[in-house]
Design a protein with these regions (language model features):
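Non-catalytic, solvent-exposed segments at the cell envelope interface
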Residues: 2-27, 31-305
């Protein structure tokens, strides 16, 4: 009986020891996961804070009666892609153009995002210039007049004047950050509407060639698709930009790895500007997980002025 009791006690001890080891290992893994998640969150927060631009108008659009917040209110986000790269720094001296302008309006009630493409050569009143001009010039004019933070402000004002809707937030990317974001997502799936050849982000001619059809694009290829404008019209170019943005948003929804998110954070470091706070970005991300996208194209004619 004593041997049986002793044997049972030894088994129970081994079982308890095994359970304890597993519990400790799980606790360590959970702690490491939480710790790494906190690290990435803090890293992202620091990046956003470093990239933050306070518009001269303040937090609230002049077309709003009061300040709004993502999820709580219907809000808008202006996406700016500027034609900045290392080769153009000397030529432009900071006064770059907006190669892409898309206004995303978020409706909290029906969970939709309306993505409106604004052709770069849209001829409209540009407040910073106090005259009519191509909307693509607003960014550079704002930079020249009011310094590096004047570019986003001028583009926001021009879009508000054109559409007569408030622009609550903005994000500004350049060639470098755009290509790295797409590569950080391991590429994006796009149904390329037309075969074409285009220069790359370094302005090397005929460096990118894409065939028509559904395919996975690298950062350079996605940029070429968004930029090319000599094969048809400015309006069609806007539609291609919508396809690319939609593909990026779709891929972001499926990102399940925190390491991929960290890659994206590192990719845009120093190459983007925004007036979004970290909590705002998380709100937009949560909103985007369950929303549908409606693409809108401004009506107009292609005319040479």
């Amino acid at each position: 009986m004593e041997n049986t009791s002793s044997s049972r006690e030894q088994k129970n001890k081994r079982k308890y020891k095994k359970t304890t080891i597993i519990s400790v290992l799980l606790a360590i893994l959970l702690f490491c996961g939480f710790g790494y998640g906190t690290y990435v969150y803090m890293k992202t927060s620091n990046l956003v804070q470093k990239s933050n631009v306070n518009l001269a108008r303040g937090e609230k659009s002049n077309l709003r009666e009061e300040t709004v917040k993502p999820i709580t209110n219907n809000v808008s986000l202006l996406i700016m892609g500027i034609d900045e790269n290392q080769e153009r720094q000397k030529e432009y001296n900071g006064a770059f153009h907006t190669d892409a302008l898309l206004l995303a309006t978020f409706n909290k009630d029906d969970k939709t995002v309306k993505l409106t493409s604004i052709p770069r050569d849209t001829y409209t009143y540009v407040p910073v210039e106090k005259k009519k001009d191509k909307i693509t010039h607003a960014y550079g004019s704002g930079f020249v007049k009011n310094g590096k933070d004047g570019g986003p402000q001028a583009s926001v004002e021009a879009v508000e004047k054109l559409l007569q809707v408030p622009v609550d937030y903005f994000v500004k990317f350049n060639f470098n950050s755009f290509t790295k974001i797409v590569d950080g997502l391991d590429g994006i799936e796009v149904d390329v509407p037309v075969e074409f050849t285009e220069q790359n982000s370094k302005d090397e001619p005929d460096a990118i060639h894409l065939k028509k059809g559904l395919q996975k694009l690298t950062g350079e290829e996605a940029l070429a698709l968004a930029r090319t404008r000599h094969i048809d019209s400015d309006a069609m170019r806007g539609q291609r930009q919508q396809l690319v943005i939609e593909a990026i948003l779709s891929k972001l929804k499926s990102v399940g790895s925190i390491t991929k998110l960290e890659k994206i954070v590192e990719a845009v470091d120093g190459d983007f500007k925004t007036n979004l706070a970290m909590d705002d970005i998380l709100s937009f991300y949560k909103y985007g997980l369950n929303c549908s996208i409606e693409k809108i194209q401004l009506a107009g004619d292609d005319l040479y002025l």
